[in-house]
Amino acid sequence: MFLNPKAEEVAKLLRAARTIAIVGLSPDRTRPSHGVAKALQRFGYRIIPVNPFAESILGEPAVPSLDQLPEVLASDERVDVVDVFRRREHIAGIVEACIRLQLPALWLQEGVVDESAAARAVQAGIFTVMDRCLFRERAALRD
């Protein structure tokens, strides 16, 4: 059974992170992913939209998949967290991409649950949070 990391570990991740790739980020302002991404920008994070149907979202160039992340990263920049707004059936493939790209942290947004994919990510050494809202967790931190 998958267990989320302890609150202090999550807080440490969110304080250290600088760049967040958001898989499934919508250009539609009414979608939850858009609101979360905008709030994350206000918190000072650089966001990278991962959406095959968008050129840019919230002023940032979009990439069609996680495999294209290197195309938009500076030479000294890395993705610290992959935040996912996709349905369960897409999660296993996203986890495999995170493993292949050696991305350090995976965040499955509230309502996104895939126990076996989350366990696979943890087994591969990826810090994994599931079924929690990254925005709410970050907003609750005292800087």
Q: Model features per residue range: what roles?
A:
Residues I20-A21:
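Conserved beta-strand elements of the Class I
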